[in-house]
């Protein structure tokens, strides 16, 4: 599928974005391991989250829906999962794969995880190594680094794991495995990554302690089913925020967005660059901070990003690069080598595609340098099958002169079903 983008004057109005992808995944997984019923509202009906639902059903969990974002999970408890009769196909979802590995590590059965061609290229050893230290066994390609991967669960022992990378997926996999180990399991990271797993496990009744960059969980808890309303996904909202920021005269409000402090780096950066941003009606929803984000177009300035803020906006870097291309001055992004192992190598993908618009972009080993302020022209762009690349280049096209065409845009529903329709709600031609 191709997506055609024509330049627009500005964005105006109120919109909402689909439910948070990270929280939707975790709600299904933790709900399945709890006793009793978990009801989820505003569940993200994207392909990645549906892969999580499918895998848990394959292990005997009864799940009703999702219908209009509503889901009912009949939890089986920590010991209730059953050996799947077939391969567990996680599609394009790295989150499903890595978090499930943590759960499967503690099961008394063998399972095999596979995925699509893109996922089969993504590294898994960062997750399998600590899980092996806990007592699970793995057999996969490239020395247990690539899917397909067989997982032989077993009796797990707790560990104190020092992660070499700030990755919520690695941390969550170890914490989920820690549910099945008697005693305390801890994960220490070089910088704080998103904390949705800790918040959700705590809400379901697990004993979780957080101190600086270390999270500690007590094994074998009694998790109890609950009702969860998933906030809007700030990573999806980021595309609308940048679109408004780069189009002078824009003024939009995105309602009910998760503003978790481990995910709000995009707000900080856009403010730094000069965008008018206001958070209204801040509230707590199921343990997660939520607010309505108002953003106005402005003349943006270049900025520098590195260090601890990077894990707080790692998924937003492609769209931040678009903002930088339309800003005055130079933007430097460092310490972001994690981008190389996403759905595409997002460093080289961003460089290649922004250059097609006429932007001046330099590739670094761990980031980018973008010289902003040059007027951009519409282009024919590749998505690389990467949903965030497709949407970032679509936003770049809104402010460019001439038409932009995004090839392979059918990957967008992975995280943002209805992206084009939401955009149309606020476009002023």
UniProtKB/Swiss-Prot annotation:
A GO biological-process term: amino acid biosynthetic process
Catalytic activity: 3-phosphoshikimate + phosphoenolpyruvate = 5-O-(1-carboxyvinyl)-3-phosphoshikimate + phosphate
GO molecular function, one term: 3-phosphoshikimate 1-carboxyvinyltransferase activity
Binding site for 3-phosphoshikimate: 21-22, 26, 167, 169, 315, 342
Family matches, as CDD domains: EPSP_synthase
Gene Ontology cellular component list: cytoplasm
Transmembrane segments: none
Enzyme class: transferase
Function text: Catalyzes the transfer of the enolpyruvyl moiety of phosphoenolpyruvate (PEP) to the 5-hydroxyl of shikimate-3-phosphate (S3P) to produce enolpyruvyl shikimate-3-phosphate and inorganic phosphate.
PANTHER family hit by this protein: AROM/DEHYDROQUINATE SYNTHASE, PENTAFUNCTIONAL AROM POLYPEPTIDE
Name by which UniProt lists this protein: 3-phosphoshikimate 1-carboxyvinyltransferase
Organism: Desulforamulus reducens (strain ATCC BAA-1160 / DSM 100696 / MI-1) (Desulfotomaculum reducens)
Gene: aroA
């Amino acid at each position: 599928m191709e997506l055609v983008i024509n330049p627009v004057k500005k964005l105006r109005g109120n919109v909402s974005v689909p439910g948070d992808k990270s929280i939707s995944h975790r709600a299904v997984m933790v709900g399945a391991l709890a006793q009793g019923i978990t009801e989820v509202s505003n569940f993200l009906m994207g392909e990645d989250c549906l892969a999580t639902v499918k895998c848990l059903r394959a292990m005997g969990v009864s799940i009703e829906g999702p219908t209009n974002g509503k889901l009912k999970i009949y939890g089986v408890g920590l010991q209730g999962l059953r050996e799947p009769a077939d391969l567990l196909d996680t599609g394009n979802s790295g989150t499903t794969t890595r978090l499930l590995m943590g759960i499967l590590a503690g099961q008394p059965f063998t399972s095999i995880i596979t995925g699509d061609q893109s996922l089969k290229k993504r590294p898994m050893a960062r997750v399998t190594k600590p899980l092996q230290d806990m007592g699970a066994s793995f057999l996969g390609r490239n020395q247990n680094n690539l899917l397909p991967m067989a997982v032989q669960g077993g009796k797990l022992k707790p560990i104190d794991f020092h992660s070499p990378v700030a990755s919520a997926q690695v941390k969550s996999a170890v914490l989920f495995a820690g549910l099945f180990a008697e005693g305390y399991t801890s994960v220490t990271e070089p910088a704080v990554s998103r904390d949705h797993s800790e918040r959700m496990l705590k809400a379901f009744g697990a004993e979780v302690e957080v101190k600086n960059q270390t999270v500690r969980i007590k094994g074998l808890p009694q998790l109890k089913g609950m009702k969860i309303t998933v906030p809007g996904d700030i990573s999806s909202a980021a595309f609308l925020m940048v679109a408004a920021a780069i189009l002078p005269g824009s003024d939009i409000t995105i309602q009910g967005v998760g503003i978790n402090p481990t995910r709000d780096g995009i707000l900080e950066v856009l403010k730094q660059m000069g965008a008018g941003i206001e958070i209204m009606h801040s509230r707590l929803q199921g343990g997660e901070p939520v607010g309505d984000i108002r953003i106005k177009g402005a003349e943006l300035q270049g900025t520098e990003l590195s260090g601890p803020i990077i894990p707080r906006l790692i998924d937003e870097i492609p769209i931040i690069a678009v903002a930088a291309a339309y800003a005055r001055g130079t933007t430097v992004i460092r310490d972001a080598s994690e981008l190389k192992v996403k759905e595409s190598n997002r460093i080289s993908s961003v460089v290649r595609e922004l250059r097609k618009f006429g932007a001046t972009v330099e590739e670094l080993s761990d980031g980018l340098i973008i010289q902003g302020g040059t007027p951009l022209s519409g282009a024919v762009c590749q998505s690389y099958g990467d949903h965030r690349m497709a949407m970032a280049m679509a936003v770049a096209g809104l402010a460019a002169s001439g038409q932009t065409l995004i090839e392979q845009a059918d990957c967008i529903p992975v995280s943002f079903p209805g992206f084009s329709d939401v955009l149309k709600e606020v476009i002023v031609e």
